[in-house]
């Protein structure tokens, strides 16, 4: 038996093929040779409830023959609950292209990111703030002044590979390796 600490989940894009660098770092430069690709994505989850989850991302990648693969950049922001919890990350990606034969190739990719997490305590509600009869009358006992809880900036790494031909592709990605 083993255990591993789990962290909050990443945003999920329903049209994941429209954001290939977010899906797998091996997709960096997976375009016709020399052809650049730019992508902009916007997601507003559950807009009818008021405090939505809004995610935006922008990416650029291109295959470069001189380095034997592709490079890319990905910037993403995820804002939850009217900005109470905000996650931003910026990534640089590289993928190596290996042509097995004329009909099949492999790409191995690596992503290095800096991630920023912030939490706005002023707009959060905790159970210890609510009186059963009078509503919100108490201050919270939660630790709001701890900078380790409010803001974090840290590096993060991901890796992946894809194999592809004219008719199919397959792949695997491992994110948040730190």
Predicted feature locations:
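Subset of outer-membrane beta-barrel
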Residues: 9-178
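Sec/Tat signal peptide C-region and signal peptidase I cleavage site
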Residues: 2-8
């Amino acid at each position: 038996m083993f255990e591993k600490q789990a962290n909050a989940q990443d945003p999920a894009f329903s049209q994941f093929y429209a954001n290939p660098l977010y899906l797998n770092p091996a997709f960096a430069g997976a375009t016709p040779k020399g052809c650049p690709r730019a992508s902009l994505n916007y997601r507003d989850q559950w807009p009818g409830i008021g405090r939505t989850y809004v995610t935006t991302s922008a990416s650029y990648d291109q295959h470069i023959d001189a380095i034997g693969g592709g490079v890319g950049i990905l910037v993403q922001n995820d804002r939850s609950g009217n900005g109470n919890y905000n996650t931003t990350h910026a990534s640089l990606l590289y993928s190596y292209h290996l042509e097995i034969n004329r009909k099949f190739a492999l790409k191995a990719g690596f992503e290095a990111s800096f991630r920023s997490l912030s939490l706005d305590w002023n707009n959060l509600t905790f159970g210890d703030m609510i009186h059963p009869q009078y509503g919100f009358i108490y201050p919270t006992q939660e630790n709001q002044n701890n900078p380790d809880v409010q803001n974090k900036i840290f590096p993060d790494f991901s890796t992946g590979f894809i194999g592809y031909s004219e008719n199919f592709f397959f792949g695997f990605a491992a994110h948040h390796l730190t």
